[in-house]
Amino acid sequence: MATVLDTPVAVRRAAMDLLARREHGRAELSRKLRQRGASPELIDPALDRLAEEGLLDESRYLESFIASRARGGHGPLRIREELAQRGLPRADIERALNACDIDWSAQLREVWRRKFARLPLDAREKAQQGRFLAYRGYSMESISRLLSGRSDD
């Protein structure tokens, strides 16, 4: 049975339920509430109040999202694009990526080691490994350095 989101209390409760599961960005939370039938006139004040109370925090969401995706083996390029698709400002994304203490080179080597564990023997293997790592969100420069055997250790 779907809850009707036609009062400020109902919208706030639905927003808090979503935030209890995981961090959300303002744009994502607004979209989810609209999908559940809440009107923008009710959503904006509810989200403003949650932000004032510290329950909705974009920087905390960015930090959580970046850490989660990095643990999953994704690189900074893919994470940056996913966050932009979720409606977050590019400047905030860049600030969060620069502030995180993730060693992207070590992350790249670990992702590569888990998947392939050996340098490519021919051009076809090198292309295959490169495509996989590029899809994961690592720069071509870092990938090229790794696959040619030059490490920045």
UniProtKB/Swiss-Prot annotation:
What's the protein name? Regulatory protein RecX
Q: Which family does it belong to?
A: Belongs to the RecX family.
Gene from which this protein is expressed = recX
Assign the protein's first listed, main location to one coarse class.
Answer: cytoplasm
Biological process (GO) annotations held by this record are: regulation of DNA repair
Question: Upper lineage ranks?
Answer: Bacteria, Pseudomonadati, Pseudomonadota, Gammaproteobacteria, Pseudomonadales
Q: Which UniProt keywords apply?
A: Cytoplasm
Q: What does this protein do?
A: Modulates RecA activity.
Query: Localized where?
Result: Cytoplasm
